[in-house]
Amino acid sequence: MGHKKYLVLLFLLAWVPAWSQVRLEHASSPQGHEALVVENRLARYTFWSDGGVLASVYLYFAPYGTKATEVVPGWDKKELLPGVSLPLEIELLGEGEGVYPDLYGIKAERKGAGEVEVRLSWQGKGLTVEKRFFIAGKAVYLVPVEVRLSGEAKGLRIILGHIPTGSKAPRIVSLCDGKPVDGFPSEEARGRIEGIGLVDAGTVYFWKFPQGLPRGTRLFHGVNRAGQPVFGLLVPELSGELILETAFYGGRNRYVLLEKAGLSSLIKLNVFGRFMVGVIHFLQFLYRATGNYGWAIIIFTIVAQILLFPLTRKQIHSMAKLQRLQPKIQKLQEMYKDDRETLQKQLIELYRTEKVNPLGGCLPFLLQFPFLILLWRAIFNSAELFHLAPSFLWIPDLSLPDPYYIIIALTVGVQLLGQWLSMRRIPEQKGQGIGWVMPILFGFLFRSFPAGLWLYYFIYSIIQSTLQAIVYWELSHKGPAKAG
């Protein structure tokens, strides 16, 4: 009865829901005014009352091969460059020119356990400004934003961001009629403007306009009052109410993540990328069917091994036959120990007669490399989806290393068992020791790899060892090859 309870507990642990709360923290801006920090499972958003801006988007979740990073342009490590404009700063034109209003009220309201609405508002001198951000705990870098302006103004600019300069600066990309355009689209080439932002190899900072630009507004790029380059929306004249509905993506530059945000056109996939995305979509299908990425990877592994089964079984047979030929091989080595050329000819003839491939033992492992590489890249490029999914057994996040190294120990143990099964029926020979050392060395060198990759290799090792046991059982009745 106790064993049944234990198995049920393990099964339920695979569906433990991940933390989805949004954390709120009140802080102070560098000028000593009110600030608000909102943290979901991937990023930390900082809002300042100074100018009512989104001051920082810090990606603190850093999957394997990446680092925590700031997305909002204008920051140099933890310092804001002098004169830089921050997102959604409003700059008045004409009379009263300047950044105005300069001090907003900040209010945060929870919309259930999984979402927070941040509201930045100001009212005075005939103008009312309200900026609303909707941050969900399990959002994949996408934040719906609404900017509402009402009153009278002789022109204003809604600054969407600072434009970095230099050789390593991100490129400016616009979306026009669903197609990416490098830089700012020319007036005559403009169609429906659907977004604009900054794209580099690691991150994307992008403002998406699902409904297009509000009537009477247009894109602009120029400099702010401090002479720093900026881009945003120009409102030539405000009379009445203007509502800007946008969605802000500030996150990693990954195709699947951008695809979920409706921004997949920002990336062009090569042939390998298409295969990788296919694997990710297959894993997502399995995840939807099972409710857990752990089971999705297990099913993916089984499917991969079924596809490779004919070749794998043939090569394991070849490897087993090679081991059974060891008495004959050792006899030839003894006979021609002083004549290596003749020895090689005799060995080649022996392999040909017995229909054995001397390299067959390596092929089952080499066949796994395409699947391992595809799965590794799939996990790397969709790590956020794994991170937001439920934990699997004792592993909290399959996109990160196993914190307890249990899956590594289990995999190494299964490989050592397979080594024992393959060696116990053949005479001891030189070089057998490497077969015992390699699994341990492999586990040590790649201990920091994602747990999802180790889960694949663990299931593969079980299947491989089981196939070896079956093949050796089939051949066990034939006995070792005679040396004579």
Where are these predicted regions, by residue range?
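Bacterial N-terminal signal peptides that target proteins for export
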Residues: 1-7
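Conserved acidic functional residues
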Residues: 2, 113-116, 368
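Helix-loop-helix
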Residues: 7, 14, 18-21, 47, ...
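A generic structural signal for solvent-exposed, polar alpha-helical segments
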Residues: 12, 53, 81, 106, ...
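N-terminal, polar/Ser/Thr-rich
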Residues: 22-28
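Soluble non-transmembrane domains of integral membrane proteins
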Residues: 28-30, 36-264
